[in-house]
């Protein structure tokens, strides 16, 4: 196969009926769900990342390592804990022959009481003879399980194939993967087939995605790394497109959960990518994703890799600095996923939902702060709660899509403006985080923000616009209370 920059896999989903909640994310969170904050990057120099939440209370993590020579696992009871969790090598490449080079995109699943790892590998005498393979693990903890090689997944053609993932829908287990098909002038397409067991497909594979759009063919004509999240009666299949540099991005296929998934016409491709590089936030080439859920099970979490710089010296395949990142996945009112933008490094952002105007969120519009429902783009309503610019135990709220811009009051109106470094700005943009005035619970789910330099005045909405005003009655206290989402 041509030297298409690093082949990648996406991850997750797929599980036995006993573990549907583990690997297939099903309906659960409402339009707003409790915020969970993480610090990115989660794991440096780990690409094609997959995180699985298992029923034993642990998150399991696997990814491609820069040396392309082994399969590793980590586990922790929290997502953030994976950052520092010990890493265990469960398998190493062969010293000769097949499975001897380019060990890429491992993905772990628990099926019918056993662990399975899907991965791609080349051969020592032909590193580009990439094919899909399966390991089977016996034991409660996959880091200490006994692993055996189940061999290669045989498909319709003996061609470049990678990024195997599996999921269950309607009681049927499917395999999805990327492959180069003879007679089609693309680097890889996405396919689906039924499975007769965790390492064997049955029937005729069906091609469901081909790189035909401009954004899918930048550098290379690639559709790869498929993975699934099931929600709201639909199956959403994300895939990665183009070369694995700053052009790399996520596309989306959608099918009804009741449709014939082995019919290509059941899958509808979104005309635009759903997740792309963002120069403002300093994130490039986001892709090869998976999905997991928050510790409380109420929020869906997007897992992916990217780089912190656009320009790469030489072949991106030789650049080791793709890193694992996580951020909350949101859902639109129509039941479709909203990926937003790859958020800046550091603490992840939240949305501030009005306590007394459900479904309305703080956003900036022409840099004026206000509350509004169905905010587009999503990032206009996302803010990072960071250490207060003026110190003293305060916090500041930084715009996600305009890093360096903060909520601040000016003439008691709340605006989103660039930090000019002045003492006045720092004071105007610093707030004490209080328990929600309307609830008094002190929980993270209900908060109010009191001005540091005008004690007794709180961020509140009056109508749609935000002001810094006193909150002396029930209405104003409710106006000054927000839930974190």
Language model features: what each stretch is:
Residues 47-48, 56-57, 65-67, 356-360, ...:
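Short polar catalytic/cofactor-binding loops
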Residues 1-13:
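N-terminal export and membrane-targeting signals
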Residues 6-8, 18-35:
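C-terminal region of N-terminal signal peptides and the immediate post-cleavage residues
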Residues 21, 376-382, 422-433, 473-485:
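Short amphipathic alpha-helical linker/capping segments at the junctions of internal repeats
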Residues 33-350, 380-387, 428-437, 444-446, ...:
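Carbohydrate-active catalytic/glycan-binding domains of CAZyme proteins
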Residues 344-368, 384-413, 432-464, 481-485:
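Extracellular glycan-recognition/adhesion modules and their associated mucin-like linkers
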Residues 13-26, 63, 119:
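Residue-level signal for alpha-helical transmembrane segments in multi-pass membrane proteins
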Residues 364-377, 411-413, 418-423, 463-465, ...:
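Extended intrinsically disordered, low-complexity coil regions enriched in Ser, Thr, Gly, Ala
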């Amino acid at each position: 196969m041509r030297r298409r920059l690093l082949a990648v896999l996406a991850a997750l989903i797929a599980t036995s009926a006993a573990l549907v909640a583990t690997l297939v994310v099903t309906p659960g969170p409402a339009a707003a769900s409790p915020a969970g904050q993480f610090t990115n990057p989660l794991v440096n120099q780990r690409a094609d990342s997959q995180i699985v939440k298992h029923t034993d209370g642990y998150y399991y993590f696997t990814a491609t390592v820069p040396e392309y020579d082994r399969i590793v696992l980590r586990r922790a009871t929290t997502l953030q804990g994976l950052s520092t969790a010990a890493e265990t090598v469960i398998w190493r490449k062969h010293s000769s022959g097949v499975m001897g080079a380019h060990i890429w995109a491992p993905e772990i699943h628990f099926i019918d009481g056993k662990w399975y790892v899907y991965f791609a590998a080349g051969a020592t005498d032909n590193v580009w003879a990439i094919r899909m393979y399966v390991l089977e693990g016996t034991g409660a903890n996959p880091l200490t399980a006994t692993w055996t090689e189940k061999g290669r997944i045989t498909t319709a053609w003996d061609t470049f194939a990678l990024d195997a993932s599996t999921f269950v829908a309607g009681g049927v287990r499917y395999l999805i993967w990327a492959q180069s098909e003879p007679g089609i002038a693309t680097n890889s397409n996405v396919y689906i087939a039924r499975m007769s067991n965790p390492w064997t497909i049955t029937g005729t594979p069906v091609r469901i995605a081909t790189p035909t759009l401009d954004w899918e063919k930048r550098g290379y004509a690639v559709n790869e790394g498929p993975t699934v999240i099931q929600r709201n009666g639909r199956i959403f299949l994300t895939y990665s497109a183009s070369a694995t540099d700053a052009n790399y991005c996520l596309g989306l296929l959608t099918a009804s959960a009741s449709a014939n998934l082995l019919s290509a016409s059941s899958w509808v491709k979104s005309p635009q990518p759903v997740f792309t590089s963002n120069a403002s936030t300093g994130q490039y080439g986001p892709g090869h994703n998976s999905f997991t859920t928050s510790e409380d099970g109420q929020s869906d979490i997007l897992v992916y890799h990217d780089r912190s710089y656009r320009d790469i010296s030489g072949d991106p395949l030789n650049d080791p600095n793709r890193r694992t990142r996580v951020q909350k996945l949101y859902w639109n009112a129509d039941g479709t996923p909203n990926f937003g933008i790859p958020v800046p490094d550091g603490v992840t952002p939240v949305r501030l939902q009005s306590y007394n105007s459900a479904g309305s969120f703080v956003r900036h519009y022409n840099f004026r702060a206000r509350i509004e429902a169905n905010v587009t783009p999503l990032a206009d309503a996302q803010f990072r709660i960071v250490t207060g610019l003026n110190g003293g135990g305060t916090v500041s709220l930084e715009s996600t899509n305009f890093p360096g811009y903060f909520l601040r009051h000016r003439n008691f109106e709340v605006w989103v403006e660039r930090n000019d470094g002045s003492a006045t700005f720092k004071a105007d943009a610093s707030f004490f985080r209080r328990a929600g005035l309307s609830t008094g619970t002190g929980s993270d789910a209900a908060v109010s923000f009191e001005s540091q330099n005008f004690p007794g005045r709180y961020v509140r909405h009056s109508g749609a616009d935000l002001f810094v005003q006193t909150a002396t009655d029930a209405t104003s206290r409710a106006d000054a209370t927000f839930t974190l989402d």
